[in-house]
A protein has these predicted regions:
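N-terminal nucleophile
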Residues: 1-200
């Protein structure tokens, strides 16, 4: 259904989310970022308020794990949710509800989390993690590399229709790139990123 990465660039304190799905309009639902605070991807049976409320909880001083537990506690549909959170300190939390469609899962790395559901196989998130860890490019490019690797490994079993790349930083220009209802949204997202960088 959706595969995503949330990450922190420890040097610039930039947070970001890259995401792709076989549905439309992923950019307005899944990724949530705030400079100096953190990044959240909320997917599965997407509850947009998890992103909005989650960032507010982080801003109030909750750790990602505490924020996640608070969000899930009163949610009767929690087992249908998939949520990954990283804060500006690099602390992380992840939840993949058992009612998400297979393959479902997440991997927590040093300064990132990858997650997905309704994927071709576990290799999707494994390859995403490898691509991000081994990337030598700038932070935004590494987020995109993770998406490309996920797609190459099989991605969403339905194929991808929309993708987004969102970052926030106090010292770098914010990125908010979205591609919707496209036959190859990740490729188009890469084109948009390069176009944006050429403007800078």
């Amino acid at each position: 259904m959706t595969f995503s990465i949330v990450a922190l660039d420890q040097e610039t304190k930039t947070v970001g989310v890259a995401t792709a799905t076989g549905n439309i309009n992923v950019g307005s639902r899944v990724p949530h970022v705030k400079e100096g605070i953190g990044a959240i991807a909320t997917q599965g049976l997407t509850e947009i308020s998890y992103g909005i409320k989650g960032l507010k909880l982080l801003e109030m001083g909750y750790t990602p794990q505490e924020a996640l537990e608070k969000l899930l506690k009163s949610d009767p549909w929690r087992e249908h949710r998939q949520v990954i959170i990283i804060d500006i300190q690099g602390r992380k939390a992840a939840f993949t509800g058992k009612e998400n469609f297979n393959f479902k899962g997440h991997i927590i790395g040093e300064c990132y989390i990858v997650a997905g559901n309704l994927l071709a196989s576990k290799e999707v998130i494994i390859e995403m993690a490898k691509a991000f860890e081994n990337g030598k490019e700038e932070f935004e490019e590494k987020l995109l590399l993770a998406l490309e690797a996920g797609k190459k490994a099989g991605g969403d079993i339905r194929g991808e229709k929309s993708a987004a790349l969102v970052t926030a930083s106090k010292i770098k220009k914010r990125l908010n790139l979205k591609v919707d209802n496209h036959k190859d949204p990740i490729k188009k997202l890469k084109q948009l990123l390069h176009k944006q960088k050429n403007k800078s």
